[in-house]
Amino acid sequence: MGRGVGCAVIAAVTAALIACGGSSRPQATRPTSPTVMAKDTVRTQPAAAPSDSATRPVATVACDSTHRDSSAVPVKEVAAHENSPRTGRSAKAKAARHPHHHHTGCAPIKVKLVRVWPAAPTPLPGALLPNTRIIAFYGNPLSTRLGVLGRMAPQVMLDSLAKTAERWQLADTTTKVIPALHLIATVAQGHPGADRKHRLRMSDETIERVAQWAQARGWLLFLDIQVGQSTVREELPRLLPFLARPYVHLALDPEFAMPGGEIPGTRIGTLDAADINYAQRTLAKLVTDSGLPPKVLVVHRFTTKMLTGAHQIERDARVQVVIDMDGFGTPQLKRATWHVTVEREPVQYTGFKLFLNPRNDHPLMTPEQVVQLWPSPHYIQYQ
C-alpha cells in the first residue's frame, strides 16, 4: 500500500439522506411555457427509501508512519451514486482528522471516499449511464420562446450544440459526451383546445424532422411531454413508434401537469411516482419487445411537490431515470434548489438545466462548475 511499514483501516459508515420534506433554503424558479403559436395539429419492486440506500466500503486508509495507529477511527462516508473522480465533492479527502490522532505518531491519513447515491440497478449492455454525459438543447422548432432548439436557424443551432458538447468534453475528459435534441413533443397550452385538454400535440412530421437532425449526426432525441389537463397514460402511447428507435428517449415535465384541472402556467403542476412508474414500465416493455438498449427517462423538477412519492419510483435496469433540476437563478440559488430537490431525494441519476437568457441564469454556470455538483450530473440541458 505505500512505502515502508504502513497501516491500513477499512471503514464504512452509512450516511442517511433525507427522503422528503421542505427546506429553509430558497428554491429556484423557471419561466412558464408560452403557448406555441402554430397550427400543428416485468413489473419491478419499488425503490428503497434513501435511508436504505446501499453503501460501499470506504477505500483503505493508509498511514505511512512506522507506528501502527491502533486508535484509528472509522471515517464517515457520505452517500453518492458512483465511485468516480467526477463527483462534486472530491473522492480524495485531503486528510482524515481526529482529536486523538496526535497520540498515534501517524502521518496525515489519506482517505478515498466511495460514495453511493443511491443503489442503482447494474447497467445493462448498451446503457448510456453512467459512462456518458448527455448535452441537450431544449425547445420546439415552431417557437422561438420555448428554448434554444427553436431560437436559431436549424443549422446554426446544430453547429452550436456540437461546439457546446466539445466544451463539456474538455471540462471532464473522463466521461464521454454525446449531444441530444430535447423536443417538447406535447406542449401545455393556456387555451383548452378542441378536446379541452390544454395541450398541443406536435404532428408526426414535426417530430420526424427533428428526429432526422439527431439521427443523421449520431445524436440522441428526447421527446418531452407536458400533459396539461391530460395524463401520461393518454399522451405516451402515441409516441411509442418514435421511442422504438434506439436513439430516442423520453422526458416528463410535472410543472405543466394539472391533475386538479387548473390552467397550465397559473400554478406549478405535479406528477406522482405512479405516473413515473407507468412510463417506466411502458418503456421497459418496449425495450424487451423490440430488443432495444436501455431507455433514459428524464423527469424535470425544481420544487419537491412537483414530484410526489419519489422514494416509490421503481428501479428497472431497462430504464434509467434522471431527475433534472430545471430551476433558474443565481448559481447559489440553483445549488440550493439542487440540494433540496435532487440531492436530498435520490432516485437514480441526475440532470441540470442551464438557461441561456441572462434574465434567468445570472451568471450562467460553466461546465467546470456544474460537473463539481454532487452527484455529478449525467444529463445537461440548455434552454
Feature roles, as predicted:
Residues M152-V156, H198-M202, T231-E234, R267-Y278:
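Alpha-helix N-cap and loop-to-helix initiation/capping positions
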Residues D204-I207, L243-P254, A273-N277, A317-L333:
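Acidic, His- and aromatic-enriched active-site or binding-groove loops in soluble protein domains
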Residues M1-I18:
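Sec-dependent bacterial lipoprotein signal peptides
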Residues P254-L292:
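Substrate-binding surface in catalytic domains of secreted glycosidases
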Residues R167-A171, K176-E255:
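Substrate-binding cleft of extracellular glycoside hydrolase catalytic domains
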Residues N140-L142, I184-A188, Q226-G228, E255-A257, ...:
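Active-site beta-loop-alpha junctions enriched in small/polar residues
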Residues C20-D52, R56-L200, A317-V319, L333-Q383:
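Alpha/beta catalytic barrel-like cores
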Residues V227-V232, T288-M306:
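Aromatic-lined carbohydrate-recognition surfaces of secreted/lumenal glycan-active proteins
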